[in-house]
């Protein structure tokens, strides 16, 4: 179980020496990455398996963490690749694709994936065969064969398949020997024993900021979708986290002071009278209790850059 953070310590360090605070938090995160990579390398050899499955709910930082683990593996002599399960989305079909209660394409369901193709690729990789990894274009809602890529695994190579459904039975049961990782922002923030900032709020801030920065989606729309995202987590993601060989906490102690400025700016666009204002009544006062840390202290390889931009990794 992860340890909570404490807002009085966070605020004291945010004001006193933000550069040192940020550096220490990033060092702790990178140490966890290195330890995870060492365990993955050891277990993959022991299991004689080349596949790692990395799952976690929205806003967990799966993409950056997977790439940082790959880098750490390479530093200890193991060549690694990352593949997003988003590439395996099937072209929507109103007759067969899962829908939300509102009749929209349910992107939180594992049945959005081309499971037959994905599981076929698992077995092909086990046999040492080449596969062509597809690409799904979310803008056109269709598979784009021009962006497909070949994947071949050598004897000392690993591939990390990362996505919200990587540990779901529909995926993981087809590859029982795979090493399994579950990642999420798992630390609450407390004030003298009282919960003052929930771990799910940390992920919501990440999602709101990322959606506005990278996808042009306003906070009101992200908040509208959040209920369906959370329902999808409870149905399709969280029940499978205890399959994981490692539970990885992606939260950082200095994170909320950094994200605060971006989130407040995004929340300003939620109009008065919007139903989404209800969801902000508890979150906004809690957020305002934090001091600020300038984003200039966030290094380019930080997981936070997945959400605020300016990072070195592709997302």
Where are these regions (language model features)?
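Conserved lysine of the Walker
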Residues: 62
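Glycine-rich phosphate-binding loop used to anchor ATP phosphates in small-molecule kinases
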Residues: 45-47, 119-177, 223, 228-240
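Hydrophobic positions on the alpha1 helix immediately C-terminal to the Walker A/P-loop
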Residues: 65-69
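Post-Walker A helix-loop "phosphate-sensing" segment adjacent to the P-loop in P-loop NTPases
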Residues: 71-81
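Hydrophobic anchor at the beta1->P-loop junction of P-loop NTPases
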Residues: 52-54
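Conserved nucleotide-sensing/catalytic segment adjacent to the nucleotide-binding pocket
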Residues: 81-83, 90-139
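Charged, amphipathic alpha-helical linker segments immediately N-terminal to NTP-binding catalytic cores
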Residues: 1-35
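Conserved NTP phosphate-binding and transfer environment spanning the P-loop NTPase/kinase superfamily
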Residues: 18, 30, 166-315
């Amino acid at each position: 179980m992860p340890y909570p953070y404490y807002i009085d310590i966070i605020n004291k360090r945010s004001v006193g020496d933000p550069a040192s605070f940020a550096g220490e938090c990033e060092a702790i995160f990178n140490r966890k990455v290195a330890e995870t990579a060492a365990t993955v390398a050891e277990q993959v050899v022991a299991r004689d398996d080349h596949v790692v499955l990395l799952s976690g709910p929205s806003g967990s930082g799966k993409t950056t963490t997977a790439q940082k683990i790959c880098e750490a593996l390479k530093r200890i002599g193991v060549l690694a690749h990352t593949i997003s399960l988003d590439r395996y989305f099937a072209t929507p079909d109103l007759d067969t694709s899962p829908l939300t209660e509102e009749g929209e394409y349910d992107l939180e369901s594992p049945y959005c994936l081309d499971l037959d193709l994905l599981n076929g690729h698992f077995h092909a990789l086990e046999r040492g065969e080449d596969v062509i990894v597809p690409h799904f274009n979310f803008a056109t809602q269709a598979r784009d064969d021009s962006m497909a890529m070949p994947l071949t695994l050598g004897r000392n190579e690993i591939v990390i398949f990362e996505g919200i459904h990587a540990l779901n039975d529909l995926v993981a049961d087809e590859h029982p020997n795979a090493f399994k990782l579950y990642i999420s922002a798992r630390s609450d923030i407390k004030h003298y024993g009282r919960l003052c900032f929930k771990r799910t709020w940390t992920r919501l801030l990440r999602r709101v900021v990322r959606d506005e920065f990278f996808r042009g989606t306003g906070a009101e729309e992200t908040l509208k979708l959040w209920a369906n995202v959370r329902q999808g987590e409870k149905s399709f993601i969280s029940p499978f986290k205890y399959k994981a060989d490692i539970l990885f906490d992606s939260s950082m102690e200095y994170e909320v002071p950094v994200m605060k400025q971006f989130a407040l700016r995004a929340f300003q666009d939620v109009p008065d009278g919007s139903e989404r204002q209800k969801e902000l009544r508890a979150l906004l006062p809690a957020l305002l209790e934090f001091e600020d840390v300038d984003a200039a202290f966030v290094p380019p390889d930080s997981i936070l850059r997945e959400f605020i931009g300016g990072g070195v990794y592709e997302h």
